[in-house]
Amino acid sequence: MAKVSMRDMLQAGVHFGHQTRYWNPKMKSYIFGARSKVHIINLEKTVPMFDDAMNFISSVAAKKGKVLFVGTKRAASEAVKEAAERCDQFYVNHRWLGGMLTNWKTVRQSIKRLKDLETQSQDGTFDKLTKKEALMRTREMEKLEKSLGGIKNMGGLPDVLFVVDADHEHIAIKEANNLGIPVVSIVDTNSNPDGVDYVIPGNDDAIRAVQLYLNAAADTVLEARAQDIVVQAEQDGFVEAE
């Protein structure tokens, strides 16, 4: 499991919350105080809660479970995609389409359409179309790729959501709650922690902080998967020669 120290968090600005006037009283127990009208998050609480969250992600990944990274705001979008791809998992980093989890049947049809269009673009079908028709299909493919590209190979519902901003992604969290899918989320001082199974109190705006969380989550998945391979090899009786 990837470890993140308090020093790492301080350097990334994890402790800086939102302006005090925007606070959510449900986050009171995680707030250390205020400085220049900005809430300061108590990292003595964040560090162990982050460890708990990573432990849970590790247990899911070790059982070959699917992790869905969700972060659609600009500060998180690119980092979410990079982290998910690095650990061979899944992501939504543009717009969360309502029903992405709760209406999976329909989403699956859209994914099938995306894959059909990708095949057509590669097997020469587009070349046989009129310029206008080819352009229309290319645009449709790009639009579908933008919203579904990160989940097109997920092959079913995820086993856990890793959310960067609980407030911004409240629809995703609600859908996961309805389906009983556990949620791990960064929750800032302006957000509501309800519906989050593993709360990580922290700054959800600073790019360095967002990258810190995502890198640790990706490392945790990779380590758990590698450990699983070692255990599997031992069970199968493979022993390296001296």
Swiss-Prot record:
MF GO annotations: structural constituent of ribosome
InterPro entries, sorted: Ribosomal_uS2, Ribosomal_uS2_bac/mit/plastid, Ribosomal_uS2_CS, Ribosomal_uS2_flav_dom_sf
GO biological process, one term: translation
Keyword Lyase applies: no
Pfam families hit by this protein: Ribosomal_S2
Record PROSITE patterns: RIBOSOMAL_S2_1, RIBOSOMAL_S2_2
GO cellular component labels: cytosolic small ribosomal subunit
Keyword set, alphabetical order: Ribonucleoprotein, Ribosomal protein
PANTHER family: 30S RIBOSOMAL PROTEIN S2 PROKARYOTIC AND ORGANELLAR, SMALL RIBOSOMAL SUBUNIT PROTEIN US2M
Family statement drawn from the similarity comment of this UniProt entry: Belongs to the universal ribosomal protein uS2 family.
NCBIfam families named in the record: rpsB_bact (TIGR01011)
Entries under HAMAP family matching the protein: Ribosomal_uS2_B
Protein name per the record: Small ribosomal subunit protein uS2
UniProt organism field: Aeromonas hydrophila subsp. hydrophila (strain ATCC 7966 / DSM 30187 / BCRC 13018 / CCUG 14551 / JCM 1027 / KCTC 2358 / NCIMB 9240 / NCTC 8049)
Organism phylogeny: Bacteria, Pseudomonadati, Pseudomonadota, Gammaproteobacteria, Aeromonadales
